[in-house]
């Protein structure tokens, strides 16, 4: 199996919505973003699948070393072997990859967040940075696109936090800000014990409003001239906002079950969004400034 095939299998096997957003990219960009996504999956799996924190720390340290080796032209892992040639084509700073690992390390060292300002740093590291790297791969002309990419990454992460409240609690993690839990009189230990608090839907509604504000901010920050190049992010936005709407329609009962979109529905959303953005781009090219 080639490094590229390894990364593609990693992305497809995860069942992630991101996979569907990559399907409409040119081959070179698709290979690059698959390698980036596979890297994120590998380091995320370290903290999600390793029950011994000391072992997880050592594995993350190994990935730090492997990342440095990749940028030095000496990759050993299939993921970094797929990433290495990508580094010659795109502006992907090594510091960004190290910061992603820093974010994963926060899952080991900090499993509570006193306020949203603390949580925002975590979102920046594990998702905002990924957005910035993705924007470099997709391409852009205006630097405001980087603001869009980081805001969008945070929006995705906030959506994940809402969806995964129960699963995260089962791992001993609470991403809902503690000051907001206190405001709604929700005991963090109740979440950890899987107990259902009647006030949780109201709190999650506030979290959803915050996530939607980041989606809106991101779309407002995206220059029209870069919109088509960044269409994968727009595909993901459509999928994730649909997911968030489904969670809302279900009454935020995330402690009872996990809301999912079927693969067919994700594919349909991805295809229709990509087609809509292609039509919009054609109209943009017909404007007087570009005709």
Where do the language-model regions lie?
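Catalytic cores of Mg2+-dependent Asp-rich isoprenoid enzymes
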Residues: 1-157, 162, 166-291
């Amino acid at each position: 199996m080639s490094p590229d095939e390894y990364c593609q299998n990693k992305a497809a096997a995860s069942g992630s919505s991101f996979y569907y957003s990559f399907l409409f990219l040119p081959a070179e960009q698709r290979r690059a973003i698959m390698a980036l996504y596979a890297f994120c999956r590998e380091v995320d799996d370290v903290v999600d699948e390793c029950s011994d924190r000391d072992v997880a720390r050592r594995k993350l340290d190994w990935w730090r070393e492997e990342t440095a080796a990749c940028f030095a032209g000496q990759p050993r892992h299939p993921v970094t072997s797929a990433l290495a040639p990508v580094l010659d084509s795109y502006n992907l700073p090594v510091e960004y990859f190290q910061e992603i690992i820093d974010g994963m390390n926060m899952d080991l060292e900090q499993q509570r967040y006193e306020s949203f300002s603390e949580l925002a740093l975590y979102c920046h590291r594990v998702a905002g940075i990924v957005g910035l790297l993705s924007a470099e791969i997709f391409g852009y002309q205006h630097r405001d696109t980087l603001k869009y990419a980081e805001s969008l990454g945070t929006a995705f992460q906030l959506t994940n936090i809402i969806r995964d409240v129960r699963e995260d609690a089962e791992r001993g993690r609470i991403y809902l800000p503690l000051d907001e839990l206190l405001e709604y009189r929700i005991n963090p230990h109740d979440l950890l014990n899987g107990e259902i608090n009647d006030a949780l839907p109201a709190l999650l509604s506030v979290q959803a409003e915050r996530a939607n504000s980041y989606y809106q901010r991101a779309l407002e920050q995206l220059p029209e001239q870069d919109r088509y190049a960044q269409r994968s992010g727009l595909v993901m936005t459509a999928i994730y906002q649909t997911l968030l709407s489904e969670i809302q329609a279900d009454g935020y009962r995330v402690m009872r079950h996990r809301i999912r979109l079927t693969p067919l529905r994700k594919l349909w959303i991805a295809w229709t969004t990509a087609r809509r953005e292609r039509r919009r781009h054609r109209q943009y090219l017909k404007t007087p400034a570009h005709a």
